[in-house]
Amino acid sequence: MSKGPAVGIDLGTTYSCVGVFQHGKVEIIANDQGNRTTPSYVAFTDTERLIGDAAKNQVAMNPTNTVFDAKRLIGRRFDDAVVQSDMKHWPFMVVNDAGRPKVQVEYKGETKSFYPEEVSSMVLTKMKEIAEAYLGKTVTNAVVTVPAYFNDSQRQATKDAGTIAGLNVLRIINEPTAAAIAYGLDKKVGAERNVLIFDLGGGTFDVSILTIEDGIFEVKSTAGDTHLGGEDFDNRMVNHFIAEFKRKHKKDISENKRAVRRLRTACERAKRTLSSSTQASIEIDSLYEGIDFYTSITRARFEELNADLFRGTLDPVEKALRDAKLDKSQIHDIVLVGGSTRIPKIQKLLQDFFNGKELNKSINPDEAVAYGAAVQAAILSGDKSENVQDLLLLDVTPLSLGIETAGGVMTVLIKRNTTIPTKQTQTFTTYSDNQPGVLIQVYEGERAMTKDNNLLGKFELTGIPPAPRGVPQIEVTFDIDANGILNVSAVDKSTGKENKITITNDKGRLSKEDIERMVQEAEKYKAEDEKQRDKVSSKNSLESYAFNMKATVEDEKLQGKINDEDKQKILDKCNEIISWLDKNQTAEKEEFEHQQKELEKVCNPIITKLYQSAGGMPGGMPGGFPGGGAPPSGGASSGPTIEEVD
């Protein structure tokens, strides 16, 4: 096989994950079971050795020979307090070999013992094979991640595990660093950033605070609980149902290992369901002594069962902040890692603790670490081809970008958090007859009206040939390159005439703090904005209707089809409405709607009559373009003269 690219491997306590950077993006690779994460489990049976899903699936039948949690042993001495306390909970045996721990199992009928590095190397081998099966190439180079608090011997042992697995470990990087790289936080411009990584996995909970400056990462503090994770939440649910079974059936299933195991599997599934639904049902046939167990649990009950554990996740956050000598307001970014951070309650507690700050969660939390490791692997293996240097570290546009349209409305072309580079084009038109030019004003921000957003720059496109309103087509293109530089161009489709502006991201752009603030304000103002948007839209719709109606009855195609009295009736009413609009630019939505009803009352009967007599109008209705009109000049809102076209 040919040599494949470098991969990133997240070697986790309970699950591992592998990713590769190719074709300009990171791909997280699924295993042969179609799962994008693989259990860090190795099982030994009379006939074979199983790794991953196969190992975890048979743990109930073969508990003493199924090894997991090797990460809790790696690089530690046998008499380490951690090893001694963990040993009590494991079904497999840990023995002392000259001061080093080894796991002892029965394999093919004989007793074998393995160092933690060997067990981890088996998991790494599996991850390597998963990547090779997907890529169809040999994989040797890898970046492997470890917790930030790992000491030198733990790091070295992890590297050794890689070597045993036949990998050339390019670098060992910290899990929180990898997660920050996944979100491209090291590529954001400006002064140093403080990033808090909240990593709640299957069996461990780690909080890390990093500072990033000029692409250099420094771990400021770490805190957490090495024995808190998804499994604990499962246990609470298991105990809840054991108690329920006792109440319902007067039987205690807690001593029956198989029953408890089946219940635990069902609980883990229910827990996952509760992250997206508010209720989950559990159905287990013949759980115990032939009794079928059918029950359900609500999200609220699940949250209540784990209330203390969920709340307790904030203690390490506070400790990490204290150790880093930072106030929570000084944290620029919060990154969620680990499957348990999908739990809505945990997200809410964390977001509330940080006063409503947005959390970085767009990358699958189980995969964020492997994602960042894959990016790092591509960089370290000198991937110049895809220009990973420039391209990646997944930069996004922090704020929406758009232009001002009729009535001072912000029309967004690029939504916030769009991955860059990106390019968007939209067509606009004029709002008054024979309008010679348009003013393109570029804004960033989340508000509905441009006056509440930040003006980045503006330019004019002139020399538009005389034409009725709504006829010219002006194509506006927003193009952001990998360095965040924005090019905005406008082209008049009829003449091909073009003008453009380049906006670089340093000057005139907002600071990170401003961005945070604006995003938060935007939430608060969303309701007001909706109202304002509705108002402008009902005003535009009334205006359009009046102008179009006027144009329709004045059209020469209708000469002789409409009697003068009807025509005058419509024109008078239209002119009355147009002059009312001039005086009442800031009226309420209801007033615009009322005026439109009045206008329709006059026009509809006449137009209907017209249609019936003409059997449909020749050439269809002239005028009438979507998006509605704009305030006539001199209106209170003297927005720029361009109009959105669907």
Swiss-Prot record:
Region Nucleotide-binding domain (NBD), as annotated, extends over 2-386
- Compositionally biased tracts (Gly residues): 616-632
- Which top class of enzyme applies to this chain? hydrolase
N6,N6,N6-trimethyllysine PTM positions read K561
Known catalytic reactions: ATP + H2O = ADP + phosphate + H(+)
Modification(s) after translation: Acetylated.
PTM-bearing positions, type N-acetylserine: S2
Q: Which UniProt keywords apply?
A: Acetylation, ATP-binding, Autophagy, Cell membrane, Chaperone, Cytoplasm, Hydrolase, Isopeptide bond, Lysosome, Membrane, Methylation, mRNA processing, mRNA splicing, Nucleotide-binding, Nucleus, Phosphoprotein, Repressor, Spliceosome, Stress response, Transcription, Transcription regulation, Ubl conjugation
The answer to whether UniProt assigns keyword Chloroplast to this entry is: no
The positions annotated for binding ADP are: T14, Y15, G202, E268, K271, S275, G339
Q: Which residues carry this modification: N6-acetyllysine?
A: K108, K246, K319, K328, K512, K524, K589, K597, K601
**Induction info:** Constitutively synthesized.
- For region Disordered, the annotated ranges are 614-646
Q: Can you tell me which residues bind ATP?
A: 12-15, 71, 202-204, 268-275, 339-342
Membrane topology, from the record? Peripheral membrane protein
What's the family?
Belongs to the heat shock protein 70 family.
- Give the matching PANTHER family: HEAT SHOCK PROTEIN 70KDA
**Function text:** Molecular chaperone implicated in a wide variety of cellular processes, including protection of the proteome from stress, folding and transport of newly synthesized polypeptides, chaperone-mediated autophagy, activation of proteolysis of misfolded proteins, formation and dissociation of protein complexes, and antigen presentation. Plays a pivotal role in the protein quality control system, ensuring the correct folding of proteins, the re-folding of misfolded proteins and controlling the targeting of proteins for subsequent degradation.
This chain's protein is named Heat shock cognate 71 kDa protein
Question: Which gene underlies this protein?
Answer: Hspa8
